[in-house]
Design a protein with these regions (language model features):
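Conserved nucleotide-sugar donor-binding catalytic segment
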Residues: 76, 149-216
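Conserved donor NDP-sugar-binding/catalytic core segment of glycosyltransferases
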Residues: 103-156
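Glycine-rich, basic loop-to-helix element that forms the pyrophosphate-binding segment
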Residues: 66-86, 107
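N-proximal low-complexity "stem/linker" segments adjacent to membrane-targeting elements
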Residues: 1-28
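The conserved acidic donor/metal-binding loop of glycosyltransferases
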Residues: 95-99, 123
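GHKL-family ATP-binding catalytic core of two-component histidine kinases
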Residues: 87, 101-102, 190
Length: 216
């Protein structure tokens, strides 16, 4: 693995400028610093997206018209515009209404550097409004995904295998075939692998799950 690899953070956005600023603040607060920011503006009419001050220290892809409204493109296809101009060794995804905890990238880069894996994701907290470190938020995997998916797996329930804070080392195809345990804003993936795959397919929904299956 490359020492101190560059991470391109791809953020699609449409008319959610104030949310986007919170997302960008969380990127700026990362303890891992070798980062480039790539924003894909999907035809927003909020003029704050187009100011010189906003453009500073970012790569911005401004799409003239909203691609979802015109062509029916899903969010995966919008991310592809950012992937195309990204120069990082890794691509990390962040939606404009999500934020990261400060050590998110550092932790994942460290884990990837000690393994043969080319992609990493994490659990995520579910909540609304500004993050409050003193508040208890439900987690997506333990509080939602594992409890919702009670179908049998290998003859036993998912909860049998995924006890609290004892997550699997990796996801297999059978798990992904049942439902999606991976939140896109938690993903970091090797850029070469993603480019070899051709990025996300143009699907109206579930393009992210389709992509994760292709990674396997």
């Amino acid at each position: 693995m490359i020492k101190n690899p560059k991470v391109s953070v791809v953020i699609p956005t449409f008319n959610r400028f104030e949310y986007l600023i919170h997302a960008l603040d969380s990127v700026a607060s990362q303890t891992y610093k070798n980062i480039e920011i790539v924003i894909v503006n999907d035809g927003s009419d909020d003029q704050r997206y187009y100011t010189d001050s906003f453009k500073k220290n970012k790569k911005i892809v401004n799409l003239e018209k909203n691609q979802k409204l015109i062509h029916g493109f899903g969010p995966g296809s919008i991310r592809n515009f950012g992937i195309d101009v990204a120069e990082g060794d890794y691509i990390a995804f962040l939606d404009d209404d999500d934020i990261w905890l400060d050590h998110k990238l550092e932790f994942q880069i460290e884990k990837l550097s000690k393994s043969e894996f080319k992609m990493s994701n994490s659990d995520a907290f579910i909540g609304e409004g500004k993050f409050n470190s003193n508040q208890r938020y439900p987690s997506y995997l333990y509080d939602y995904y594992f409890k919702k998916n009670k179908e049998l797996m290998y003859g036993k329930s998912l909860n049998y295998y995924f006890k609290k804070y004892q997550y699997p080392k990796y996801w297999d195809f059978m798990t992904l075939a049942r439902s999606n345990p991976i939140i896109t804003s938690t993903v970091i993936i090797e850029a070469n692998l993603l480019n070899q795959m051709g990025g996300f397919r143009n699907l109206p929904f579930a393009a992210d799950l389709d992509c994760w299956k292709a990674v396997l």
